[in-house]
């Protein structure tokens, strides 16, 4: 049994889309965890592009599967899982997962078609991705024995929709009891946990009701994957030089029918073309244009106050001039100093200048 401090948690300190998938892949290749953990929902995408240009776009499967020492993938009890999506992601990476084990916690929730249909109408008003995640979570919370949507209660469904096809591809996968799941956690040599979405979207720390259906803090991520807090020895928080929110929603006539929510008082919403001279980014899941904002001291301070990261990954540095990036770094350091965040400075240890692992630097570029 290995019970020493051994886990890294990757979280988002803004509104999402900060490059968690990119830094997760980078760290997995560098730190080589044998166990990777997630408890995602199907409403957020995570992208990693390796040094050879292979692209991984996952909503269910950890990007840490690229670890050279990987043995086990754990999907935690706090997940709201789209089984077909997980199946497809596993099959697309079957070459990397040969001889590996994938365990799905029996208490993870399944997103069924009825949950997607339940969110189809009213959730448009708050910019929801409408993937059924909240509805699946609510169904689990209701605890109706006649409507049990946990993985453990739907063995036939899991066998038909995911386990059978995945095993045929040579990847071992099954449902795990809590005891079986925790045995892997305790026996692991090194663990990497990947959070989803972002601090400012948290149901308690965000701009309610323009939020997601749970918190996105390291503590919540640990709870959702059943990771003992004592095992955590590093928290990496991801930020963008220019934070984003998901798109507003419009009908076929071009009329706005949904708003994804406000920003912090010291932020300004920017126009992709007029202010930045570039095409708008599209969201990974909905393929709609993201809203983009200036960097916020208030957002940074609020996030660091709760997250208390050991390191920061500052992404999209290529969107700004070097002096502007330096100003953002200064804002992060000022917030960290005011909050007495421990550890060596600067807090920003990794800098992203593009979409691939080759674009991550350990020093800020000056040209």
Curated annotation (Swiss-Prot):
Family: Belongs to the Caudovirales PurZ family.
Pathway: Purine metabolism
Protein keywords: ATP-binding, Ligase, Magnesium, Metal-binding, Nucleotide-binding, Purine biosynthesis
Known function: Involved in the synthesis of the atypical nucleotide dZTP (2-amino-2'-deoxyadenosine-5'-triphosphate). Catalyzes the condensation of aspartate with deoxyguanylate into dSMP (N6-succino-2-amino-2'-deoxyadenylate), which undergoes defumarylation and phosphorylation respectively by host PurB and guanylate/nucleoside diphosphate kinases to give dZTP. dZTP is integrated into the viral genome instead of adenine by the viral DNA polymerase. This Z-base probably completely replaces adenosine and forms a triple bond to the opposite T-base. The resulting non-standard viral DNA is called Z-genome.
Cofactor(s) the protein requires to work: Mg(2+)
Active site (catalytic residues): 17
Pfam families: Adenylsucc_synt
UniProt keyword GTP-binding, yes or no: no
Keyword Membrane on entry: no
Gene Ontology terms: biological process: 'de novo' AMP biosynthetic process; IMP metabolic process
Enzyme class: ligase
SUPFAM superfamilies: P-loop containing nucleoside triphosphate hydrolases (SSF52540)
Positions that bind dGMP: 17, 43, 128-129, 143, 212
One GO MF term attached to the UniProt entry: magnesium ion binding
Enzymatic reactions: dGMP + L-aspartate + ATP = (2S)-2-amino-2'-deoxyadenylo-succinate + ADP + phosphate + 2 H(+)
Positions with a binding annotation for Mg(2+): 17, 45, 284
Gene name for this UniProt entry: purZ
Gene3D superfamilies linked: Adenylosuccinate Synthetase, subunit A, domain 1
Protein name as catalogued: N6-succino-2-amino-2'-deoxyadenylate synthase
Binding site for L-aspartate: 284-285, 290
Binding-site positions, ATP: 17-21, 45-47, 197, 315, 318, 354
């Amino acid at each position: 049994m290995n019970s020493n401090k051994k886990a890294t948690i990757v979280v988002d300190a803004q509104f999402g889309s900060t490059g968690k998938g990119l830094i997760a892949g980078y760290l997995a290749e560098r730190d080589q965890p044998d166990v990777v953990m997630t408890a995602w929902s199907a409403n957020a995408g995570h992208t990693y592009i390796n040094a050879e240009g292979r692209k991984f776009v996952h909503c269910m499967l950890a990007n840490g599967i690229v670890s050279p020492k990987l043995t086990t993938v754990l999907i935690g009890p706090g997940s709201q899982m789209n089984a077909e999506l997980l199946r497809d992601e596993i099959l697309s990476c079957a070459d990397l997962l040969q001889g590996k084990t994938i365990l799905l916690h029996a208490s993870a929730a399944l997103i069924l078609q009825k949950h997607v249909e339940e969110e189809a109408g009213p959730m448009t008003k708050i910019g929801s991705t409408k993937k059924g995640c909240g509805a699946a979570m609510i169904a689990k919370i209701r605890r109706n024995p006649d409507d049990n949507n946990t993985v453990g209660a739907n063995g036939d469904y899991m066998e038909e929709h995911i386990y059978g096809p995945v095993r045929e591809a040579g990847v071992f996968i099954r449902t795990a009891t809590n005891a079986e799941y925790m045995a892997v956690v305790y026996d692991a040599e090194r663990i990497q946990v990947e959070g989803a979405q972002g601090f400012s979207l948290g149901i308690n720390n965000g701009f309610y009701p323009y939020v997601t259906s749970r918190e996105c803090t390291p503590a919540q991520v640990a709870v959702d994957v059943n990771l003992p807090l004592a095992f955590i020895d590093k928290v990496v928080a991801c930020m963008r030089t220019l934070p984003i929110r998901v798109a507003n929603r419009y009908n076929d006539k071009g009329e706005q029918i949904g708003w994804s929510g406000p920003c912090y008082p010291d932020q300004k919403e920017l126009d992709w073309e007029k202010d930045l001279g570039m095409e708008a980014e599209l969201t990974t899941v909905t393929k709609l244009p993201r809203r983009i904002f200036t960097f916020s001291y208030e957002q940074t301070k609020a996030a660091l106050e709760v997250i208390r990261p050991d390191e920061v990954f500052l992404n999209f540095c290529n969107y700004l001039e070097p002096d502007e990036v330096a100003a953002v770094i200064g804002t992060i350091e000022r917030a960290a100093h005011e909050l007495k965040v421990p550890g060596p400075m600067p807090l920003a240890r990794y800098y992203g200048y593009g979409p691939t692992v080759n674009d991550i630097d350990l020093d800020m570029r000056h040209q």
